Structure formats: C-alpha cells, structure tokens
Regions:
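Short secondary-structure boundary/capping segments within folded domains
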Residues: 60-61, 70-72
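Short hydrophobic/aromatic beta-strand element in the GNAT-like acyltransferase core
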Residues: 68, 78, 148-149
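N-terminal juxtadomain amphipathic helix
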Residues: 57, 67-68
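Catalytic micro-motifs at enzyme active sites that drive phosphoryl/nucleotidyl and oxygen chemistry
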Residues: 136-140, 148-149
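Short beta-strand
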Residues: 58-59, 139-142
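Glyoxalase I/VOC metalloenzyme domain signal
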Residues: 1-29, 35-56, 73-136, 152-249
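Short acidic/glycine-enriched loop/turn segments that link adjacent beta-strands
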Residues: 62-66, 143-147
Length: 249
C-alpha cells in the first residue's frame, strides 16, 4: 500500500470550529517513543515485568526498514518503541542516557520516565511484581506530591511508578529555584496561567522558517518542502490508515 492509497486524493485536511479555547492544551501523553535496538526484548520486558500488553507492531509509517511497537498503559496512553536499522547500541552515560534517576544527561534527552497508578497500594503491588521478575526496585519514597518506586529497564532506561495528582502550584513552585532559573514573579504567573487562544475558522498560516524557533532536523531542501506543503497535501500524502492485519469481514 502506498501512502496515497489510504486517503482519497480529494480528501480535505480536517477543520475546526472557530471559538476561544481557554483550556486548550495537551491533556496527556498519547505515546512516548523510545529508540531501541531490540524490539522483542523491550516488548517482552514491558509485558512480563510491568504487565503492559503489546497493542501494535508494524512497519513505521513513512520510514524505511523501521519497526514501530506500542505497549499500553491505558486506553489513551502508550509507550512506543522505534527500531531503526541504524540505531546505535552504545550507551554513554551523561550523554545518551542518565546513569540513574538523579544523574545528568544531555539537554533534551530523557532523564527518567514515570508511570502513573492510582494508589500507594498499587505502587507497592507494582514493586512486588517487578521484584518477582528478578529486577531490583528502590523505594517506595514519599515526595509529598507523589509516592514513587524506581528501577531500571532494558537498554539503560530509568523508570518510575508513582501515584499522585493535582499538584498545587502554590506549594510546589520554590521561589529559590524560580529565581535560579531566571524566572520573574510576573513570568511565573504567566507560566502558571497560560493565556487562552482564539482559534478562527481558517487555519493559521505556516510561519516562515526562523532559526531562533525549535525545528525538526531534516536536510534543508526536504524540510523546506515539508513546511511549504499545504496541510491537505500532508494529510493526503502521509496518512496510512489501514492496519496490517484487517479484521475478517
């Protein structure tokens, strides 16, 4: 199947209703994608040790010779794995990985991954499940706003299971740390209360390339072509909607 087979050529890009959206924000992590050199080992660990079922394993859309796997945390939250044939296997602590949940690592890299359960009882049950598979666990630890256990996963992953929700920003934004981060009192109020946005009937035009803004890294010509394409062209050209194993009719 080609990418253009999945969506009719005349299919328009999705549209939205014009409205002020005071609470518009991402409401969770749909999937966190982790690079791997051993898809089977990762899926096996997450199923056996953590109880997370494998929900998808297929050729990654638009990427040659690359596997994409998903394990389920909940119905709208997954851990994903990407096995590209050129993925390096070397771990360099402090650069590619943090050595432990409190260790330094390159900015933008994953420091540790914390997964939610509802109660301390479930945290302790997860501790026992993980230990029953021979994996050592540190904790529990009460951080005040969350209660956590810490352990390691394949390929140098630093993992955490915790319970806790509804963090009170009036208690948990330390003025000393705020100042050391160069954040003024006015700025912290803006960070605590992001401004609403008014979304119009017409899509916001793609902004011009600006090196001062975050950008995905592609070869220059490829990047300009992708960012210069219309939303409808991307929707029609890159969408792949058919699962690899269709349900029987």
């Amino acid at each position: 199947m080609t990418t253009t087979d999945a969506v009719p050529a005349a299919s328009p890009a999705p549209t939205i209703e014009a409205v002020i959206r005071p609470h518009l924000r991402p409401r969770g992590v749909n999937h966190l994608a982790i690079s791997t050199t051993d898809m089977k080992a990762q899926l096996t660990y997450w199923a056996d040790v953590l109880g997370c079922p494998t929900k998808a394993l297929y050729w990654m859309h638009g990427v040659d010779n690359t596997f994409h796997g998903f394990v389920e945390l909940s119905g709208d939250s997954y851990i994903a794995f990407v096995q590209h044939p050129d993925n390096p296997s070397e771990v360099e602590y402090g650069v590619t990985h943090a050595a432990n949940p409190g260790a330094p690592v390159t900015g933008g890299a994953t420091q540790h991954i914390a997964m939610h359960v509802d109660t301390l009882d479930e945290v302790l049950a997860m501790r026992d499940r993980i230990r029953s598979h021979g994996v050592q666990v540190m904790g529990p630890i009460d951080h005040g706003m969350i209660k956590s256990i810490y352990f390691a996963g394949p390929e140098g992953l630093n993992l955490e299971v915790c319970c806790g929700s509804d963090i009170d920003e009036n208690q948990w934004i330390d003025p000393e740390v705020q100042g050391l981060c160069g954040i003024s009192d006015d700025e912290v109020e803006r960070l605590k209360h992001p401004a609403p946005i008014e979304i119009g009937e017409s899509p916001v035009a793609q902004p011009a390339t600006d090196s001062s803004k975050p950008q995905m890294s592609y070869p220059s010509a490829v990047y300009e072509a992708l960012m210069g394409a219309s939303d409808a062209d991307i929707w029609n050209g890159a969408s792949e909607t058919s699962p690899p194993v269709p349900l029987p009719e």
